[in-house]
Amino acid sequence: HNAMPSPILKELAQVITNAGNDDEVKVIVLKSGGDRTFCAGASFKELIAIDNLEAGDLFFSGFANVINAMRTCGKIIIGRVQGKAVGGGVGLASATDYCLATKYAAIKLSEISIGIGPFVIEPAVSKKIGVTAFSQMTIDAENFYSAEYAKEKGLYANVFETIEELDQAVNELANKLASYNPEALSELKNVLWQNTENWDTLLKERAKISGKLVLSSFTKEKLASYK
C-alpha cells in the first residue's frame, strides 16, 4: 500500500533537493505507483522494530526531511493523488504547492489511534487545510474523509472521476508551468512558504515527540496487534 520506509524517505528528500537545484527541471510532480493507495504513511514494519529513542527520532525525521525538502525546493511541486492517503501521505500531499486527485483519494489521520500522533506533519497539514479540519481529522482518527471533503478544505485543487482524467490535468498543468518564467515561479514558491523558516527546527522537535511515543507500552501493544 505504498508505505514509506526510511530508505525511500531519504531518497525522496534527496531527489526533491536535487531537482530543486537543477536548472533543467521546470516543475516537479509528486506521484506514487499503482492505482489503489497514494501513500499509507509510516511503514508499520519499521515502527514495530523501533526499540530506542535515537531510532525513533531518526525514523520520524525521515518525513520531516521530505517536507522540509519540498518546502525549500525552488520549484513548484504538483501532487498527483490517485488513491487513499493516510498519515504521512496526507502530510506529503499537504506539502505540495498544488494538488490534484481522483474521487478515490480519501484521507485519514490515524496516528492517535495507534498511540502516536501526526505531529511531524501537523504544520504542513494545518497550513493547508486549517487547524479546525486538522484537529477534527486527528481526533476522529479511525475514519476516512472523502476526496470531496479534502477539496472543500483546500487540500485538493480539483477531484477527477478517473486516473486518466487526473493524469491529463496534471500533464496540462505541468506543461503550462514549464512555459512560465522560472524566476517568477521561484519567487512565488518563496512567498507561498514564507514564515516557515523555523520548520527545520520545529519538525525535528516534532519527530522527537513521535519517536518517544512509539516506545510507550501502549503503542508497542497496539502495534503488536497488527502483526
Which ranges hold each PLM region?
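Terminal peptide-recognition signature
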Residues: E11-L12, L30, S43, I76, ...
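Conserved CoA-thioester-binding segment of acyl-CoA-metabolizing enzymes
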Residues: H1-K31, N68
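C-terminal alpha-helix plus adjacent terminal tail
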Residues: D22, D35, A141-Y149, I163-K227
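Acidic-histidine catalytic/liganding microenvironments
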Residues: D22, I50, C73-G74
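Charged catalytic carboxylate motif
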Residues: P7-E11, G62, A69, A169, ...
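Glycine- (often His-adjacent) and acidic-residue-rich active-site loop
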Residues: S32-V66, A85
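Crotonase-fold acyl-CoA enzyme core
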Residues: A69-Y180
